[in-house]
């Protein structure tokens, strides 16, 4: 048995030029990762349309997520979480430009 210990809130990478995706665990169709954003948004006209479910928890910063078919983005603040089922088209409209936005994301695919 091995044990891995870390702290999601420390040693944040520089993310002012691009989002940083850092895998924490990958096992049998499940991936847990830390995402660090700093003012990024999904490019205009692009949508995420994933083959897997994704649950995200906002640990710091703020973000706005637009779900296809909705007229206004959902505002996420520290502690908010969101479940995006497979093929739920969505886009990140905004992340805080003045502070890192830190996400914990869990991805899984049911066969």
Per-region residue spans from a language model:
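Short beta->alpha connector loops
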Residues: 39-40, 63, 88
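Residue-level recognition of conserved beta-strand positions in structured domain cores
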Residues: 34, 60, 67-69, 86, ...
């Amino acid at each position: 048995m091995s044990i891995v210990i870390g702290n999601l809130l420390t040693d944040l990478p520089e993310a002012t030029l691009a989002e940083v995706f850092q895998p924490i665990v990958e096992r049998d169709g499940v991936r847990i990762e830390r995402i660090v954003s700093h003012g990024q948004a999904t490019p205009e006209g692009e949508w995420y349309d994933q083959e897997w479910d994704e649950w995200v928890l906002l640990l710091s910063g703020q973000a706005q997520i637009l779900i296809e078919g909705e007229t206004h983005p959902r505002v996420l603040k520290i502690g908010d979480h969101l479940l995006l089922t497979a093929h739920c088209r969505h886009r990140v409209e905004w992340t805080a430009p003045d502070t890192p936005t830190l996400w914990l994301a869990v991805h899984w695919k049911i066969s």
